[in-house]
């Protein structure tokens, strides 16, 4: 991509910005369009154009492709929020044992049509995973995955291995038959990492959970600072794990957009509290990682957050370039230091060099 194409991509993704450089629209190429869809930012991009009154100022095919995705998101979210309410009813007397994550809350916070979700993620205390799972099973959910548009049940081995090695269960799925959502998928997480070893932290977050109320929706979710830290931890887990790099799913922009949204809405005092909470939980480096990468990929109007993150990692410059392979316990380092160049690379795996084992990291 050309420099101008990259700038247009960045501007279209930065939906919280109050200004937009119209000169960038001449770079509205199929290349930019492809990157928007690849990074699941197509609806957000249309929302940005609409916000600035520029939907009619860009190539028609470019705009119409984004508009279709935007309108589809609005339709899908109607069904998604129906599913959030339905799940809340199933778990109505389990309030102190879980919190809904990511899309269940964020889809209501984003501008309309700019974000949707394919599933509902739950954070559950490890000792309550079986109870929550039983509630879902009693409501008609089955464990498995969607393959080629159809449900495929998980084997007992897959169910056990997921709980033992991934810190999450095999998804619980039910066919709900809504116009824009045929299946409802619920993912139960009981760890912030692939290894189910941070149970104390998970329990503390759930004990501090809050209920966010909207006009037509109540969502039990994590407290704002813990919600931010969970997003950062989830992003870090995927961005620094070799299989995700190999699949080119390690730096998908929509994940950074969530952090961009929360940081854009936070003033300095609120940002300081986020980092203070991260230090309490021992996740300050992970949060710094997410903030630094987000500040490079979006036009983030929170200079304090970026500066604070840089300060946290100043003595560990390799932290933001480290990738691990859980299978063979190897450690890798990105040879390309520029985050934006890594993001737009066609194959990030070739930018890695082996750097010892995890035990020696």
At which residue positions do the language-model features occur?
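Conserved NTP-donor binding/palm subdomain of two-metal-ion nucleotidyltransferases/polymerases, i.e.
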Residues: 1-118, 124-361
